[in-house]
Amino acid sequence: PSLYEAKYVIDVLDEQPDMNLLKALGKRTAITTAGMDVAITSKADQQYDCVSRYFAPVAGIEEDPVTGSIHTAIAPLWAEKLAKNNIIAYQASSRGGVLYCNVLNQERIEVSGYGKLYMQAEIFP
């Protein structure tokens, strides 16, 4: 993914990416999604260390509500900038959420948080 660091939280909150352009720049195949998934992040104030949003329209996800995997890239960035290993991140989508990230080293990041049941289904054989 492309990771963009914004200067201000308001830049993250106000971001309105051109989904059609991101789709056109990316390419989806039966096996992989290549191309334009984008995360935007900035330093947060007080309650959180950083705030982020994540867009992946090529994969059929215009904006993902809370994305643990993208925070394996975001957390080390802020761990280094803030000189701390435990990062509290807020993903500011309409269903947003808090992620607790522990940067053990550049290869290992633990991400945790609280979940809510969004959907339930049964699949029959």
Question: Where are the regions a protein language model picked out?
Answer:
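Active-site proximal loop and beta-alpha junction motif in alpha/beta enzyme cores
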Residues: 1-125
